[in-house]
């Protein structure tokens, strides 16, 4: 007990104040005309015809999303800015780290901003990149305690700060191209995980929306809670491993055959990209992002405001895909009002068996049956979704991670924003509202395809049940499918937690 009290006293009087200082100003971003870069020159003529428009390529497939990131890095000439919530130290992440290193070696300036919650370890490959002269790495809102196993003490002592995370996801290349959506960096976001793969969606945008995303990145990069790796307590130990940066190419666990196949796919992507062979959509794109100051003080979410406005203005249909769905009473009233007007409301979210957050599902359950009885089409992902084969291997589980909304087959809201209190009031988020009917229809068809292979919740004999088609036969479940009694019990216990804190 005495040792525990000593630890707490050291933590309170040292740890709690360990990161309250002014972060040194890092180097200023280089200035250049993005339209003169190799990527920018491809679309300069078309986009300059209408400066208010942006171009977009939809990234539905996970592996294709990885190819786009790697290909863009290889085509980069001036700068790369990456902002993400999670960066895992696995195969996909190591591939991207290696590509960023190669880009830096040829003079590209690279800046990487990671949320501390999503960092596997201070000794991940991505952290080693900070020792390259052309690469800077910062950690957003970091824990003072660097040992993950001991962080619960800091969470208890500094909960109000620690609970607020940077959930934004941006991948900006040469200030002209930006990937925005739900994907973090890790194997299960790129269909390369044996255990669980995330169903997700993002898009590659060119033009004006990229410059707005860049402005947002700058605000976060210079925010006082974005801490350089050099100021972390583990920096000295990390510096001892700096020599490992030269061995990144050797560390990637991939066979020569797989490497050759991957190289061919990347080269094929670059060739198709430069020949405009990917479907490209043009339209007005509005970039939306929270201020990083939301971490320190309550602020209205511009994404939530835009979502509610588009929802109220919908005339025909709304299709919402959100991995976490806790709408709250105010939004439920909006849903009810729109359904009463004849608007078709479709909702796709995780089931209890597919979710990675049981407590969130417990909160969602409070609204689920109400929405079904209101007349909404509610779908929950089956954890064996697609049962698809990935690179010769079967992943055992699928979970929805996307955050995408389509309004009237015209507007699409795409980004990191879930329909829940955490996205609205606690975390920081980023998204794009894109006005293009063809793009919206393509996204809706993708979501509809997901829904058709999911559980459909319907009212049967006055109760809500789950139904799905399996091998041409309609099947029904009266309790959460593919779950144990113990899992359902945990879900029930979780309902004592305050909804606003989830």
Swiss-Prot record:
The keyword Transmembrane helix applies. It is found in: Cell membrane. Belongs to the phospholipase D family. Cardiolipin synthase subfamily. Pfam families: PLDc_2. PANTHER family: CARDIOLIPIN SYNTHASE (PTHR21248), CARDIOLIPIN SYNTHASE C (PTHR21248:SF12). It comes from the Bacteria. It comes from Helicobacter pylori (strain ATCC 700392 / 26695). One of its GO terms (biological process) is cardiolipin biosynthetic process. GO terms for molecular function: phosphatidyltransferase activity. Its main location: membrane. InterPro entries: PLD-like_dom (IPR025202), PLipase_D/transphosphatidylase (IPR001736). Keywords: Cell membrane, Membrane, Repeat, Transferase, Transmembrane, Transmembrane helix. GO terms for cellular component: plasma membrane. Residues 162-189, 396-423 form the PLD phosphodiesterase domain. It is a single-pass membrane protein. Disulfide bonds: none annotated. The chain crosses the membrane at residues 1-21. This is Uncharacterized protein HP_0190.
